[in-house]
């Protein structure tokens, strides 16, 4: 069975012979009103700078989706773990958007893999905040990443509202594509992800490929999956003046420049870009990002590699960039390279293309959706350095003249299909479907006391997909 796309009508065969007809569910979905949403992002704050620590595309997704939901008149509260004593309990980001910094465990010294021990404390903080409101304050809970999902289904049960979950990444997928030096995801995460998949009322994924992974690995119900592409801020990321951007970054007008943007860790494979560029005389590379995850073990490792390759004078290291500064980097370079071993979508690829900059990307995960091979960039199968050097060289050569202008225009046009407005439409469709299904489910329980006593999906299952 194919997963349902957000916006497609269909409510499942389970409504037959239980007192609630499919037409009833469709009507409940159409009538569903989303007024207030609780977003859960335990392990990383939407206010953190992408490219540092665990902050990346998910942070952008959570913040931008909240801002755009608020523009539709929906109140959004984002719950994240406080990581410093100076973090205020509540931050009003914009009209209709609050970030609640929940104290759960020590502020420092914990990484993502320590956080399962603090989920009870985090859940208590979330429930305590909700208790200050009138009953029924939130209409829906949307959890991001498996840690948040663990809190999400507890909140769902307490508040009697549906849970929508976005995994962003899956342990089994990451473990199947480990880079040298990367630590595998622990079994605890695999078990936790299975629990959340079983408990969530709806599952939102970035691509059809991710939906297939959820179905094959975690036996997710295809009828509960909605495909929602992330968006890009087309006001910030849009074509700009290359020479002006190069002047600001101290780059020569005529030189060929490649950029790597992201967290510096084995999973993102920045070393592949350096090794490939080392084979291309005269090509400069900009690396924008900070060490993260396994990369923290050797924070200067990439600079040392540049020295070993003899290209240190051709490499410019920049700290993680603000959105406006990142757009300037994209304007300045000839192409952006994304050689990740695993990538659920690849938001950087879309942001670069929105600026009219073509992309060379690994043909993994969601990148074949984010990049149109041969139109807005080039996809590379595998991580062979010679193949990457050839792909980068080929795109640099084709960028010259009229062909380059055509690809730049095609890149911007492709990226424009990933607007946050489209993403918000799809999110709301998924939310309404979740509310409709959830309401119908509660009516079934009222009409069928035996069904109300049936075990939870998770407790009824045997084994965990891996």
Swiss-Prot record:
Group of enzyme by EC: transferase
One Pfam family per UniProt: Glyco_trans_4_4
CDD domains: GT4_sucrose_synthase
Subunit note: Homodimer.
Protein's name according to its UniProt entry: D-inositol 3-phosphate glycosyltransferase
Keywords: Glycosyltransferase, Magnesium, Metal-binding, Transferase
Catalytic activity entry: 1D-myo-inositol 3-phosphate + UDP-N-acetyl-alpha-D-glucosamine = 1D-myo-inositol 2-acetamido-2-deoxy-alpha-D-glucopyranoside 3-phosphate + UDP + H(+)
Binding residues annotated for Mg(2+), in chain numbering: 330-331, 333, 357
Residue sites binding UDP-N-acetyl-alpha-D-glucosamine per the record: 49-50, 57, 263, 268, 321, 343, 351
Organism: Mycobacterium marinum (strain ATCC BAA-535 / M)
Alphabetical list of InterPro entries matching this protein: Glyco_trans_1, Glyco_trans_4-like_N, Mycothiol_biosynthesis_MshA
SUPFAM superfamilies xrefs: UDP-Glycosyltransferase/glycogen phosphorylase
Chain residues that bind 1D-myo-inositol 3-phosphate: 43, 54-59, 112, 145, 169, 189
Highest taxon, organism lineage: Bacteria
Molecular function GO terms recorded: acetylglucosaminyltransferase activity; D-inositol-3-phosphate glycosyltransferase activity; magnesium ion binding
EC number: 2.4.1.250
Role noted for this protein: Catalyzes the transfer of a N-acetyl-glucosamine moiety to 1D-myo-inositol 3-phosphate to produce 1D-myo-inositol 2-acetamido-2-deoxy-glucopyranoside 3-phosphate in the mycothiol biosynthesis pathway.
GO biological process terms on file: mycothiol biosynthetic process
């Amino acid at each position: 069975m194919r997963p349902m796309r957000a916006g497609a009508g269909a409510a499942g065969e389970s409504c037959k012979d239980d007192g609630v007809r499919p037409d009833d569910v469709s009507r409940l979905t159409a009538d569903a009103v989303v007024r207030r949403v609780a977003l859960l992002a335990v392990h990383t704050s939407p206010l953190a700078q992408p490219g540092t620590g665990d902050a990346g595309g998910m942070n952008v997704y959570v913040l931008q989706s909240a801002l755009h939901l608020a523009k539709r008149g929906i109140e959004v509260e984002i719950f994240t773990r406080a990581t410093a004593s100076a973090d205020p309990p509540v931050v009003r980001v914009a009209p209709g958007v609050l970030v609640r910094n929940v104290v759960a465990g020590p502020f420092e010294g914990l990484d993502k893999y320590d956080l399962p021990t603090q989920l009870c404390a985090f859940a208590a903080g979330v429930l305590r905040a909700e208790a200050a409101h009138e009953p029924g304050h939130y209409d829906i809970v949307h959890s991001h990443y498996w840690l948040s999902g663990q809190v999400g289904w507890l909140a769902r049960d307490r508040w009697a509202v549906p849970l929508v979950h976005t995994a962003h990444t899956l342990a089994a997928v990451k473990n199947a594509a480990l880079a040298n030096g990367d630590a595998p995801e622990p079994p605890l995460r695999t078990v936790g992800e299975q629990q959340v998949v079983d408990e969530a009322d709806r599952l939102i994924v970035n691509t059809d490929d991710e939906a297939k992974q959820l179905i094959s690995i975690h036996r997710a119900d295809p009828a509960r999956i909605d495909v929602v592409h992330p968006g890009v801020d087309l006001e910030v990321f849009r074509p700009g003046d290359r020479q002006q951007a190069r002047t600001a970054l101290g780059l020569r007008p005529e030189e060929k420049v490649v950029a790597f943007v992201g967290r510096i860790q084995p999973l993102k494979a920045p070393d592949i870009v350096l090794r490939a560029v080392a084979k291309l005389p005269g090509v400069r590379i900009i690396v924008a990002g900070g060490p993260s995850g396994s990369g923290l073990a050797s924070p200067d490792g990439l600079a040392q590699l540049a020295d070993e390759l003899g290209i240190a004078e051709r490499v410019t290291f920049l700290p993680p960039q603000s959105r406006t500064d990142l757009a300037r980097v994209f304007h300045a370079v000839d192409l952006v390279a994304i050689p990740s071993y695993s990538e659920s979508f690849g938001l950087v690829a879309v942001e670069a293309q929105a600026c009219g900059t073509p992309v060379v990307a690994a043909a993994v995960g969601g990148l074949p959706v984010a990049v149109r091979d041969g139109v807005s960039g080039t996809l590379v199968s595998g991580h062979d350095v010679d193949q990457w050097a050839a792909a980068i060289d080929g795109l640099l050569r084709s960028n010259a003249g009229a062909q380059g202008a055509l690809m730049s225009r095609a890149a911007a046009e492709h990226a424009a299909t990933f607007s946050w407005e489209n993403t918000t439409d799809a999110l709301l469709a998924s939310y309404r479907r979740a509310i409709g299904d959830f309401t119908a489910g509660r009516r079934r329980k009222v009409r069928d006391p035996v069904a109300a006593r049936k075990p939870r999906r998770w407790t009824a299952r045997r084994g965990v997909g891996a």
